[in-house]
Regions:
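N-terminal leader/targeting and assembly helices and adjacent pre-domain segments
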Residues: 1-209
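Acidic, glycine-rich two-metal-ion catalytic cores of nucleic acid-processing enzymes
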Residues: 203-231
Length: 231
């Protein structure tokens, strides 16, 4: 009985460490979004918007190209965090499995070959898991979707900020705030007016059931979900 309790405590310890690491990965993604918001603010500081004008990336080819670069880098780094976390936690799960097997091998009649088979890391299965699709989208496509949503939100935020004469520093602060509090942005866009902008904001404001209005929060949830599934 004492050995069983000791095993339970040991296995729970593996789980606790896993959840701590998973939150660390999610925080890495949050920092990537903050960096991207700062890059969008820096980009906006070089734009000369006519008085009363509306900002749209399509009207500023150079800014649009820079925005595409920001989104591409963001998506690549998020995917790297997720896949690295998946591999790390997959192997952590193997260690947990090893601990469990070690506790029963003392009294089992498994051969050495059978025990080794149970303890295999099966990285081929991990690779297949990482390449799977959900709703027709692979991991890269799902990550890209959220990164693209950030660009749309930043476009609205830049439009509002430039219209209010915000400095690059002020805009950077606002854009960072919008990452976790998108409602602030949608209210300001609504107050500013403009049917086109309201239409785009409304679409982002009602993303669908089970989906955050915040691209950053959606990406963090994706990170947690993918890594937890690998574990």
């Amino acid at each position: 009985m004492a050995k069983e309790n000791q095993l339970i405590i040991q296995l729970r310890g593996f789980d606790a460490k896993h959840y701590t690491r998973t939150e660390r990965y999610a925080k890495q993604v949050a920092k990537l979004y903050q960096t991207a918001a700062d890059e969008f603010a820096s980009l906006a500081g070089k734009i000369n918007l006519p008085a009363g004008g509306t900002f749209n990336f399509d009207d500023f080819p150079k800014a649009k190209k820079q925005a595409r670069g920001i989104v591409t880098r963001l998506a690549g780094k998020i995917e790297a965090v997720v896949t690295s976390g998946q591999r790390s936690e997959w192997l952590a799960a193997c260690q947990k499995n090893d601990a469990f097997l070690a506790s029963i091998l003392r009294t089992s009649k498994l051969t050495k070959e059978e025990a080794e088979r149970y303890q295999a890391r099966n990285l081929e299965a991990l690779s297949a898991f990482q390449k799977r699709k959900e709703n027709g989208l692979n991991l890269s496509q799902r990550v890209w979707k959220y990164a693209e949503e950030l660009k749309d939100a930043m476009e609205l935020g830049i439009d509002v900020g430039l219209g209010e004469g915000k400095s690059a520093q002020q805009l950077s602060r606002d854009l960072r705030q919008y990452l976790n509090e998108p409602d602030r942005l949608y209210r300001r866009v609504r107050d500013k007016g403009g049917n086109l902008r309201l239409s785009k904001a409304a679409k982002m404001y009602h993303p669908g059931q089970g989906v955050y209005r915040s691209s950053a929060k959606n990406a963090q949830r994706l990170t947690r979900t993918e890594i937890n599934m690998a574990y």
